[in-house]
From Swiss-Prot:
Residues 387-403 have a biased composition (Basic and acidic residues). Residues 16-28 have a biased composition (Polar residues). Belongs to the ANP1/MMN9/VAN1 family. Pfam families: Anp1 (PF03452). The gene is anp1. Keywords: Endoplasmic reticulum, Glycoprotein, Golgi apparatus, Membrane, Signal-anchor, Transmembrane, Transmembrane helix. This is Mannan polymerase II complex anp1 subunit. Glycans are attached at residue 122. GO terms for molecular function: mannosyltransferase activity. It is found in: Endoplasmic reticulum membrane; Golgi apparatus membrane. Signal peptide: none annotated. PANTHER family: MANNAN POLYMERASE II (PTHR43083), MANNAN POLYMERASE II COMPLEX ANP1 SUBUNIT (PTHR43083:SF2). The M-Pol II complex possesses alpha-1,6-mannosyltransferase activity and is probably involved in the elongation of the mannan backbone of N-linked glycans on cell wall and periplasmic proteins. GO terms for cellular component: endoplasmic reticulum membrane; Golgi apparatus; mannan polymerase complex; mannan polymerase II complex.
Length: 430
C-alpha cells in the first residue's frame, strides 16, 4: 500500500534510512583523554580559587558574602542576641554596654538647640553608648543648619569622650497647620488633631532610628531648661518598662514662681472612664481643660519639694517631655497611636497601649525637670495690663513729684527776700 511507502521505513518522505542511529566516529582516543584531563585541571583550579578567595564574590552586588559572623570585616551578615535587649537592666555598671537611642522631634527649634546640646554634652552616661536621632518637620526657620553646626562641634571635639556613637537626621513634613506659639500648641481645639499628627512624627522617627542593638529609648523635648546630667541613669535604675519624671516650669514672681507643666502623666479615674464611654469613636481626651473634667490624679500635683525623688507612682497616661522606655516595648509593637486608642492619642495613648500589653508604666512625682517658661495669651494680657498700670503709676508719681517741687522749693520775691515754706526755716528766737 502507498501508505507504507509514504510513512513507512522503505524510503518514503518520512522514512529514516538506515533505521538505527549511527554515531559519528569517536576520533583519536588518546586526544580525547588529554582533552578531558585538561578540562578537569581547569575546573579544579577554578574551584580552589573561588574557595580560597571568597572576596571575589563580594565585589559583585549580586553575590553575597558567605560570612556569618557579626564582627567580620566587610560582612553583610549581622547577628544580634535580642535576649540581651529583652533583659535590659541598669544597675550602675556600664560594662554590659547597653546602648541608648535618644529621640528628639524638632519643629522650629533653632533657638533651643544651644540649650539642648548643653544638656547632651553634659550627660554622664558614656557617649559612645548613645545614638542621637532627630526628625525635623514642618519647619520654616534654620533648625537644620543650626543642628548641623552643633553636631559638627560636638562630634569633632578634641575630647573624644564627648563624641556620640551615631547621629541620624531626618526631614519629613506632616502638613501641620498649628502655630508654635504657646496658645497655638495648647489651645483646646487643636489638641486632638495635633496629638495625632505628633504621634505620626514620633512613629516615623522611631521606626527609622531604632536598631536591634538598642536597649533603651529616651524621648526628650529640646526646650527643657533644667535637668540632672544623670537623668539617663536615674530613670534606668528604676527598672521599669516606661518611666517619666515630673515636669514643672518656672513663672515670673507675679504669677507664683512655678507651675506644673506636664499634665499628661496621670492615673486613670472612674470619672474619666465614664466620660470616654460618652465620646465619639475618633474623639481624644486631653487633660487640663474644663471641657474634659476627668478628676484623675496627676503626677504633677503630687509633688513635694522635699519628697524622696525615688518614690514611684503607677501611671496610665504619660507626657512626652521626657520618656525613658526599654527598647523591647517598641520592638514588641507598642508605639504612639495616631488615632483614638481608648479615647487617647500620642504619648497618653502610648501609656494606655503599653498597659494593655502588660508593660509597667510609672512616674516619679518628686523627681523634677524644668521646662522653659513660655507666656500664654492670658499671661501676655496680664503682663500688658501690669505694664499699663506701671506706666500710669510712674506718670502719677512724676506728677506728684512736680507738685512737691513747686510747693517745696522757695522762689525769690521782688526784693530778693525768700518766700515759701522754707523761707524762715533758720529763724530763731533769742
Amino acid at each position: 500500500m502507498k501508505a507504507n511507502r509514504d510513512f513507512g521505513r522503505d524510503g518514503g518522505p518520512f522514512s529514516i534510512t538506515p533505521n538505527r542511529f549511527q554515531p559519528k566516529s569517536s576520533g583519536n582516543p588518546i586526544f580525547r583523554q588529554k582533552t578531558i584531563r585538561t578540562v578537569g585541571i581547569i575546573a579544579l583550579t577554578l574551584v580552589l580559587f573561588l574557595f580560597f578567595h571568597r572576596s571575589f564574590f563580594s565585589s559583585f552586588g549580586e553575590f553575597p558574602s558567605f560570612s556569618s559572623t557579626a564582627n567580620a570585616p566587610n560582612s553583610d551578615v549581622q547577628e544580634y542576641d535580642l535576649r540581651k535587649v529583652m533583659n535590659a537592666k541598669f544597675t550602675g555598671d556600664y560594662s554590659p554596654k547597653e546602648k541608648v537611642l535618644i529621640c528628639a522631634p524638632l519643629r522650629n527649634a533653632a533657638e533651643h538647640l544651644n540649650m539642648f546640646f548643653g544638656h547632651m554634652n553634659n550627660l554622664t552616661y558614656p557617649h559612645e553608648l548613645i545614638d542621637l536621632a532627630f526628625l525635623i518637620s514642618d519647619t520654616d526657620d534654620n533648625t537644620l543648619e543650626v543642628l548641623k553646626q552643633h553636631l559638627d562641634a560636638i562630634q569633632n571635639d578634641e575630647d573624644e569622650s564627648k563624641h556620640f556613637n551615631n547621629v541620624l537626621i531626618m526631614l519629613k513634613d506632616f502638613g501641620a497647620i498649628f502655630g508654635q506659639e504657646f496658645s497655638d500648641r495648647h489651645g483646646f481645639a487643636a489638641q486632638g488633631p495635633r496629638r495625632k499628627l505628633m504621634a505620626r512624627a514620633r512613629n516615623w522617627l522611631l521606626s527609622a532610628a531604632i536598631q536591634p542593638y538598642h536597649s533603651w529609648v529616651y524621648w526628650r523635648d529640646v526646650d527643657v531648661e533644667t535637668a540632672p546630667n544623670t537623668i539617663l541613669e536615674d530613670l534606668m535604675r528604676h527598672d521599669k518598662d516606661i518611666i517619666v519624671p515630673n515636669v514643672y516650669r518656672p513663672l515670673p514672681d507675679w504669677l507664683g514662681n512655678e507651675q506644673p507643666y506636664d499634665l499628661n502623666s496621670w492615673a486613670e479615674s472612674e470619672t474619666a472612664l465614664q466620660l470616654a464611654d460618652t465620646l465619639g469613636e475618633d474623639d481624644v481626651i486631653v487633660e487640663g481643660y474644663a471641657e474634659y473634667a476627668t478628676w484623675r490624679p496627676h503626677l504633677a500635683y503630687l509633688r513635694d519639694p522635699n519628697g524622696d525623688p525615688s518614690v514611684e507612682m503607677p501611671l496610665d497616661g504619660i507626657g512626652g517631655v521626657s520618656i525613658m522606655s526599654k527598647a523591647k516595648v517598641h520592638l514588641e509593637g507598642c508605639e504612639f497611636p495616631a488615632f483614638s486608642f481608648e479615647k487617647h492619642a500620642e504619648t497618653e495613648g502610648f501609656g494606655k497601649m503599653a498597659k494593655r500589653m502588660g508593660f509597667s508604666v510609672y512616674g516619679l512625682p518628686h523627681y523634677v525637670i524644668w521646662h522653659i517658661y513660655e507666656p500664654s495669651d492670658d499671661d501676655k494680657r496680664i503682663m500688658a495690663e501690669m505694664e499699663r498700670e506701671r506706666k500710669e503709676r510712674e506718670a502719677a508719681e512724676l506728677e506728684e513729684a512736680k507738685k512737691y517741687q513747686t510747693a517745696g522749693f522757695t522762689q525769690p520775691d521782688d526784693q530778693g527776700a525768700e518766700e515759701g515754706p522754707l523761707a524762715h526755716a533758720d529763724d530763731h528766737v533769742d
